[in-house]
């Protein structure tokens, strides 16, 4: 995405970014109608991928068409993020709503300076979910106006595609499975971690049965061997270190105890935060 950006180019976005925006919208200060923040990502030979984001505190003044961003907060948070993810750069900004707001041109000027040589993009997402759909659109500003006269900006749609990795698919399938379960008392809760482990183990067992059936058929000359499948099986077997059953059982039980300890600690912290929040509300009243 250079200054001569092609409107036919595609920009990819990670599902985690969408969940981060929804989380920021749910945690927005009382009285605020929308949230906005910085989009971060990578640029690889003209292919852009939005991988991260963070909200930026702001205050709108619609009567005078002005918006005040907490620039110091945005700069400090960006610097902190760069220490952890040094390959991420500013790609633009996001805001919640149904369409591009009037303050978009003002924010474009700020993020154009932050993006440097690339042109910033603007992600608009309807986080209210009133239509039961997550409406997400990506825009890019184009200069319009008469030569020698006053210039303006027009925000045009840019193709956007969700990029799913293996870890993303696991999480999305878990969310989909939970959302399709009817009759549960708490639909908003995730599946217990141990249930997910059992489901993953059952899926691996089914795949192993399929592989063993194929190998036995090839050895019994019931099926013609496939070199592509053989190389894939060889790569899968050599990628896993050779362990005896006792060492594997010990390693699995150790990881399982660590996971149970993490679940217990997170539950205790969550309960403590809920109690602290209720006590603070009682003091305010």
Swiss-Prot record:
Primary localisation category: cytoplasm
Gene3D superfamilies (alphabetical): Cytidine Deaminase, domain 2
Record localization: Cytoplasm
GO process terms (BP): formation of cytoplasmic translation initiation complex
Domain MPN: 11-145
One GO molecular-function entry: metallopeptidase activity
GO cellular component, one term: eukaryotic 43S preinitiation complex
A Pfam family of this chain: JAB
CDD domains assigned: MPN_eIF3f
Ranges that cross the membrane: none
Keywords, sorted A to Z: Cytoplasm, Initiation factor, Protein biosynthesis
InterPro entries: eIF3f, EIF3F/CSN6-like_C, JAMM/MPN+_dom, MPN
PANTHER family linked: EUKARYOTIC TRANSLATION INITIATION FACTOR 3 SUBUNIT F, EUKARYOTIC TRANSLATION INITIATION FACTOR 3 SUBUNIT F-RELATED
HAMAP family tied to this protein: eIF3f
Biological function: Component of the eukaryotic translation initiation factor 3 (eIF-3) complex, which is involved in protein synthesis of a specialized repertoire of mRNAs and, together with other initiation factors, stimulates binding of mRNA and methionyl-tRNAi to the 40S ribosome. The eIF-3 complex specifically targets and initiates translation of a subset of mRNAs involved in cell proliferation.
Recorded family membership: Belongs to the eIF-3 subunit F family.
Subunit structure: Component of the eukaryotic translation initiation factor 3 (eIF-3) complex. The eIF-3 complex interacts with pix.
Protein name per Swiss-Prot or TrEMBL: Eukaryotic translation initiation factor 3 subunit F-2
Organism encoding this protein: Drosophila yakuba
Gene: eIF3f2
């Amino acid at each position: 995405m250079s200054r001569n950006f092609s409107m036919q180019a595609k920009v990819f976005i990670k599902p985690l970014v969408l969940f981060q925006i929804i989380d920021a919208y749910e945690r927005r200060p009382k009285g605020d109608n929308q949230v906005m923040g910085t989009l971060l990502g990578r640029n690889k030979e003209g292919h852009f991928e939005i991988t991260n984001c963070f909200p930026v505190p702001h205050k709108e003044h619609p009567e005078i068409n002005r918006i005040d961003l907490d620039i110091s907060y945005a700069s400090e948070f960006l610097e902190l993020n760069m220490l952890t993810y040094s390959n991420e750069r500013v790609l633009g900004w996001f805001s919640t709503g149904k369409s591009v707001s009037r303050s978009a041109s003002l924010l474009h000027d700020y993020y154009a300076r932050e993006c440097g040589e690339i042109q910033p993009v603007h992600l608009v997402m309807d986080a209210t979910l009133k239509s039961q759909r997550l409406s997400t659109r990506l825009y890019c500003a184009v200069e319009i106006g008469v030569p020698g006269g006053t210039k303006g900006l027009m925000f045009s749609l840019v193709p956007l595609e969700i990029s799913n990795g293996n870890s993303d698919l696991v999480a999305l399938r878990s969310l989909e499975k939970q959302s399709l379960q009817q009759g549960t008392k708490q639909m908003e809760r995730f599946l217990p971690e141990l249930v997910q482990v059992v489901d993953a183990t059952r899926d691996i067992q089914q795949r192993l049965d399929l592989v063993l059936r194929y190998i036995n058929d090839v050895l019994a000359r019931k099926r013609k061997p496939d070199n592509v499948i053989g190389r894939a099986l060889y790569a899968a077997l050599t990628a896993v270190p050779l362990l005896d059953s006792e060492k594997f059982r010990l390693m699995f039980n150790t990881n399982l105890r660590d996971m149970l300890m993490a679940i217990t600690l997170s539950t205790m912290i969550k309960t403590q935060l809920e109690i602290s929040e209720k006590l603070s509300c009682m003091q305010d009243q």
